[in-house]
From Swiss-Prot:
Residues that coordinate or bind GTP: A17, H18, I19, D20, A21, G22, K23, T24
One Pfam family hit: GTP_EFTU
PANTHER family: RIBOSOME-RELEASING FACTOR 2, MITOCHONDRIAL (PTHR43261:SF1), TRANSLATION ELONGATION FACTOR G-RELATED (PTHR43261)
Family: Belongs to the GTP-binding elongation factor family. EF-G/EF-2 subfamily.
Main subcellular location: cytoplasm
Record GO biological process: ribosome disassembly
Listed name of the protein: Elongation factor G
Region of interest (Disordered), residue spans: 45-79
Molecular function (Gene Ontology), one example: GTP binding
Protein localization: Cytoplasm
Role description: Catalyzes the GTP-dependent ribosomal translocation step during translation elongation. During this step, the ribosome changes from the pre-translocational (PRE) to the post-translocational (POST) state as the newly formed A-site-bound peptidyl-tRNA and P-site-bound deacylated tRNA move to the P and E sites, respectively. Catalyzes the coordinated movement of the two tRNA molecules, the mRNA and conformational changes in the ribosome.
Taxonomic path: Bacteria, Bacillati, Bacillota, Bacilli, Bacillales
Amino acid sequence: MARQFSLENTRNIGIMAHIDAGKTTTTERILFYTGRVHKIGEVHEAQPRWTGWSKSKSAGSRSRRRRQRHNGKATASTS
């Protein structure tokens, strides 16, 4: 099966930090400000938009991965 997106613009990033250091919050903001999600979920309200969070946390795992496609254009916050 042929790829449906170009690898030329693909970037891999990793976020590593201590427990409760803000990894999910950082990921939420990256997805929001790059336009991948249109609403920010709040971790302290157990409503993060990033899939896999609740399953991972309940299983005691703090390691997650998710593939996202992005056009490389970030939006700036005006607030």
